[in-house]
Amino acid sequence: MQTQQRRDILLAMVPYSPWRGEGVRRFAREAGWNLLEWSSLPGGIGGWRGDGALVTLRNDPELAALVRRLRRRGVPVVDMTAEHPDVRIPRVCLDSRAIGRMAAEHFAERNFRHAAWFSTDWTHTHALRFGSFAETWAALPRTAGPPERHVLMEEMPRSRWNDSRAVGRWFASILRGAPKPLAVFCPGPAESSRVAAECRACGIAVPEEVAILCTGDDQMPCENQAVPLSCILVGGERQGYEAAALLDRLIDGEAPPKEAVTMPPKGLIVRASTDFVAASDPLVARALALVAENISRPWGVAQLCRTLGVGPRRLCRHFADELGRSPGEEIQRQRLARAAALLRDTDLTLDAVAERCGLCHAQYLSKIFRRETGLPPGAWRKKSGGA
């Protein structure tokens, strides 16, 4: 029996993403590819005669020229960005509109009324994410106007971009003057870390006055903050794998898809930077604090009312006016959030997780977790990359 010839594939990612790269490498191992990094090509592409290429078509003119040369030769190419939508090329992209929706809904669930976007530059991907964030925000019933958009490279002269003090003053002037509590959405850990640092410098409390959410797969810069940063996991590894799979099919002769293939975000890791429900009503604010402090106790609305010294009707009315949900729904929401964090970050048994969330036993945890997420706790833990 004749063995299939190994395919020679070029990988040109600028800048390199280890998560996308791992997805590509995993498919390459399964398919038996010879995978070559663009940067390691001796003497450039001139003498290379491969079968296909995976690229990230951003603003690198050399990479754009590479793609043009490959396509003139008839070499299949798959792009892993949403940039340069005018270039007709097969793509496997992150679903930036879904990411924007997820961010807006996350902040709205926490009762934030004001929102803003901060980024260093402005790309087509940023436009998609912010556009979806703004559209979703505007459609939500309890928000106070459209989110503000702040882009450093648009609002500061080019000569000041690398002036750390000037950049700090730019951040500080916006953050000090913004309405509070403010929900801030950033495209990556670098911008969100800078927002957090400027909040500390200005004496602005995170998350009570400014809550911060970013996107990305690299969790080290999110975890290693004075206030750890919440993050939407974009799922770069799956994107890399699916892009490689599409390229393999194109080499086999499959017709390219008419539209870009989009990969939904993997999920959202809630950390301290958004782990807060904004409440201007003093009674609701006190109730929320009590629920958070006593989340491991198996108590409900009756015990909460006794502690606050108010009747259930009054408390329900205040919650409905302030949050649009009942005290019981908020207790359940906080319990599920706590359970999700424990499943993701610890190797505790389901019984231990249930106990720490104020639930009776693992069976009840499984019931409500499946109802709210569509997955049993064990499957959710595996999907989220938990212990």
Description of each model-found segment:
Residues 315, 319, 364-365, 369:
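Short hydrophobic/aromatic patch on the recognition helix
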